[in-house]
Amino acid sequence: QAVVIDREVPLASASLIGCAVLTGTGAVLNRAKPRPGSSAIVIGIGGIGLNVLQGLALSQAGPIIAIDTNPAKEAAAKLFGATHFICAGPDVDTAEAVKEICPLGVDYAFECVGHPALIRQCIDLLDWGGSCVLLGVPKFGSEASFVVQSLYNDKSILGCRYGAARPHHDIPLFVDLYKAGKLKLDELVSQTFEPEQVQEALDA
């Protein structure tokens, strides 16, 4: 689909709306629809995870807990809206770290990696009535498990494709949010390449 946008928006920044921004921010605004003050975890702080964070910030959610194995991602996570950062690893009890912040669990858990074990962890960390939103894409044919009784506490598992987006509606909306200073796009661009540098870009 082709969507006309304002010429004032830099193309390098605008190009990101059509993928990571729609997928991540759209998952929050269109699929999860959290109320202000809702607690959330985001597992996997890549391009999609960062946009989930800023969608949660736009929704006035909080606490917003970012989780990743790379400690270098903490600064970006907090720039995009995380109130807390947990560096996951073999020596860290991630579930315990989350419960130190939200003792009863969280209202929303966004899995942005695509790993069955992390999907299970998201479900286990939900509070009563919480929702797990699946964004990461696991290996084809993968299966994930959960304790059936846990879902009787009004928990939900929500699949989400492309941020449940309507491009002709959502892209102009995100452009307007960007122009109003409420949506970060420029900060998502780490480097640009000319067409003849395609191999360099692939190797970067």
PLM features: residue spans?
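C-terminal hydrophobic helical "lid"/dimerization subdomain
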Residues: 71, 97-100, 104, 120-124, ...
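Glycine-rich phosphate-binding loop and adjacent beta-alpha segment
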Residues: 116-182
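N-terminal Rossmann-like NAD(P) cofactor-binding module of classical short-chain dehydrogenase/reductase
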Residues: 109-110
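Short loop/turn segments at beta->alpha junctions
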Residues: 90, 114, 194-197
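Conserved beta-strand scaffold positions in the cores of enzyme catalytic domains, especially
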Residues: 85, 157-159, 188, 192
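Mid-domain Rossmann-like dinucleotide-binding core that forms the NAD(H)/NADP(H) cofactor-binding site
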Residues: 6-91, 96
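Glycine-rich phosphate/adenylate-binding loop and adjacent beta-alpha elements
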Residues: 1-3
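Short, surface-exposed connector motifs at secondary-structure boundaries
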Residues: 36, 57-61, 78-81, 100-106, ...
